[in-house]
UniProtKB/Swiss-Prot annotation:
GO terms for biological process: nucleotide-excision repair; SOS response. It comes from the Bacteria. It comes from Prochlorococcus marinus (strain MIT 9301). Residues 429-583 form the Helicase C-terminal domain. Residues 639-674 form the UVR domain. It is found in: Cytoplasm. The keyword Cytoplasm applies. This is UvrABC system protein B. Residues 25-176 form the Helicase ATP-binding domain. InterPro entries: Helicase/UvrB_N (IPR006935), Helicase_ATP-bd (IPR014001), Helicase_C-like (IPR001650), P-loop_NTPase (IPR027417), UVR_dom (IPR001943), UVR_dom_sf (IPR036876), UvrB (IPR004807), UvrB_inter (IPR041471).
């Protein structure tokens, strides 16, 4: 039974109906690989949404970075509001892997900061895969890393059912074994508390509490409860509480793992002793024996992931179980921007192994640590049964898997043509660019400028700023979420120009951009290859007046091919518009904060409030309007006001002032409705 309910204010048109028909037919007939070659702005995501809806398969949509994954997730959530569209990326805000530098005899311990909200979204994804068929998981490459054992994770779930008698002490022990902790004062995700005949649990996979009401040993009621106000949100007949961590090891398996680790330790110590590596042997023995004691006493140790092979009972060299193994057998893989994502997949394993080998050779880890790894590319494709590659510029590897065949989608639903390409000499390019920027700024349009080096981007940004241009610089040191904010500020008109090096390409949805300027377009190389040029030019393909300026003194082969392909598409698009009487019109895509509000990455403190820098911004902007009528607030002030009121609501609840908290909650609800109506 197909449970997907696709909701969209428009029907497929242009090339979309034919592309959908061919892709669906390929999936239903068991085709292993298919490629959708879709030009920028032709609605590839909508096409894929239709394919998922018509095939009814659980789907994994793979993106090559967090920013694009967030954008895709938001778009798919809009198309499937009644289905489970989940988000799965690395949960590290900061990650420094364990490493050793032999030249300087420097050991670097692993340090990491885990983002609780992303961890919750990851748990939500695996829970949905166990409980529903209508699931779309949008993930980054981190999904190919080990994620426990799905069968053990499912088996460890603690089940409650209304009318059933339970042994409360036994159930509490099960929660503790599943890495929940008891805290009778404050309950958050991963904690539980018991007061009289009421057990409350903060599940790892959502921000609602589960309340189990008992009458003696019998479960009398199961409810979802608002953690702030205590309001009952929903009553249930039964519920499964999944473990607080994905890595679940039963007691009997832990004992056999400890035995296997001891055996491997002895073998490696004998090897080091035979080779005369006494320092390495002493180091390994000391570290491993300490870890074994920790595992024996508390079931956990620092760096426990390095013993994953033994803890999961895998054979040496066997692939780890990852997110893919949580999917049912008939799932569908969609690889977005495949020309970038596939090479990433193929490179992850080798980079991981080179670091691990140094640690093993110098006695910091046992050889089995090498099996705590991402999937090899061949292991990944073996687990993937049916794949759709999506790209405006598919790589040769993807085309080879499809025997050179692809499904083309060139016509935009808006009728907008590919950008006009204008090649100009590099002499005087900066002054020329400045005049073009001023023309666009007067029309309230946006400009992207891409340079070859970081230094050039910095210097250009300084020059434009000195000439009273509202400009920002996007570079690799900016965190993913700040990057989303910068891109959104560009769309909202906070500034007119965005300068970058290699960050202004795949997947950025910027309908307000009418001009893309490529400096030094004739410098042949990765950043000015045919595929890179087509992708960069495509950033102006959503605007009716889209233009790509290429500053160059020579025509390279890459430039010729990119220009030729763009002209080919323009010819097809122009002919289609003439035949069908279509006049190009703006995309009119909403500017929204949904990505930022959806992620909420590192914006909250451990106590649950907003980050200090954001609080300062919110305080400055909203102190004046907190006391005024909500109807007097400007639309752009509403998000900040809502966040400020949420802080006050949580503070009121902590002080047990539930009446004020409830009033604030109702006020927030009305403000959200007002915001939704105007978006």
């Amino acid at each position: 039974m197909n449970n997907y309910k696709l909701q969209a204010p428009y029907e497929p048109n242009g090339d979309q109906p034919e592309a959908i028909k061919k892709l669906v037919k390929g999936v239903n007939t068991g085709k292993e690989f298919q490629t959708l070659l879709g030009a920028t702005g032709t609605g590839k995501t909508f096409t894929i949404a239709n394919v998922i809806q018509q095939t009814g398969r659980p789907a994994l949509v793979l993106a090559h970075n967090k920013t694009l994954a967030a954008q895709l997730c938001n778009e798919l959530r809009e198309f499937f509001p009644k289905n489970a569209v989940e988000y799965f990326i690395s949960y590290y805000d900061y990650y420094q892997p364990e490493a050793y530098v032999p030249v300087s005899d420097t050991y670097i311990a692993k340090t990491a900061s885990i983002n609780e909200e992303i961890d919750m979204l990851r748990h939500s994804a695996t829970r949905s895969l166990f409980e529903r068929k209508d699931v779309i998981v949008v993930a980054s490459i981190s999904c190919i890393y080990g994620l426990g054992i799905p069968s053990e994770y499912l088996k460890a779930a603690v089940k409650f059912e209304v009318g059933k008698s339970i042994n409360l002490r036994s159930y509490l022990r099960s929660l503790v074994e599943n890495q929940y902790t008891r805290n009778d004062i404050e309950i958050t995700r991963g904690r539980f508390r018991i007061k009289g005949d009421v057990l409350e649990i903060g599940p790892a996979y959502e921000d609602r509490l589960i309340r189990i009401e008992l009458f003696g040993d019998e479960v009398e009621a199961i409810r979802y409860v608002d953690p702030t106000t205590g309001e009952i949100l929903e009553s249930l007949e039964q519920v499964s509480v999944y473990p607080a961590k994905h890595f679940v090891t039963p007691k009997e398996r832990l004992e056999s793992a400890i035995s296997a680790i001891r055996s491997e330790l002895k073998t490696q110590l004998d090897k080091f002793t035979y080779e005369g590596k006494l320092l390495e042997a002493q180091r390994l023995e000391q570290r491993t024996k300490y870890d074994l004691e920790m595992l024996k006493e508390v079931g956990y140790c620092n760096g426990v992931e390095n013993y994953a092979r033994h803890l999961s009972g895998r054979e040496e060299g066997s692939p780890p179980e990852c997110l893919i193994d949580y999917f049912p057998k008939d799932w569908l893989l969609v690889v977005d921007e495949s020309h970038v994502t596939c090479p990433q997949l193929h490179a992850m394993y080798n980079g991981d192994q080179s670091r691990k080998k140094v640690l093993i050779d110098h006695g910091f880890r046992l050889p089995s640590a090498a099996d705590n790894r991402p999937l090899k590319c061949e292991e990944f494709w073996e687990k993937s049964k049916q794949t759709l590659f999506i790209s405006a510029t598919p790589g040769q590897w993807e085309l080879d898997q499809c025997d050179g065949e692809f499904i083309e989608q060139v016509i935009r639903p808006t009728g907008v043509l590919d950008p006009v390409i204008d090649v100009r000499p590099s002499e005087g390019q900066i002054e020329d660019l400045l005049s073009e920027i001023r023309i666009r700024a007067e029309k309230n349009q946006r400009v992207l400028v891409t340079t070859l080096t970081k230094r050039m981007a910095e210097d250009l940004t300084d020059f434009l700023s000195e000439n009273k241009v509202r400009v920002r610089y996007l570079h690799s040191e900016i965190h993913s979420i700040e990057r989303i904010e910068i891109i959104q500020d560009l769309r909202m008109g906070e500034y007119d120009v965005l300068v970058g090096v290699n960050l202004l390409r795949e997947g950025l949805d910027l309908p307000e951009v009418s001009l893309v300027a490529i400096l030094d377009a004739d410098k042949e190389g990765f950043l000015r290859a045919e595929r890179s040029l087509i992708q960069t030019i495509g950033r102006a393909a959503r605007h009716v007046e889209g233009v790509a300026l290429l500053y160059a003194d020579n025509f390279t082969d890459s430039m010729k091919r990119a220009i030729s392909e763009t002209e080919r598409r323009r010819t097809i698009q122009k002919k289609y518009n003439q035949v069908n009487g279509i006049t190009p019109k703006p995309a009119g895509k909403k500017i929204e904060n949904s990505i930022l509000s959806f992620l909420e990455l590192s914006r909250k403190l451990d106590a649950g409030g907003l980050s200090k820098d954001l609080i300062n911004i919110v305080n400055n902007k909203t102190d004046a309007i907190l006391g005024s009528s909500d109807n007097q607030c400007l639309l752009e002030e509403l998000p900040d006001l809502i966040e400020k009121l949420e802080i006050k609501m949580k503070d009121a609840a902590k002080e047990l002032n539930f009446e004020e908290a409830a009033n604030l909650r109702d006020r927030i609800k009305k403000l959200r409705q007002k915001l939704a109506r105007n978006n």
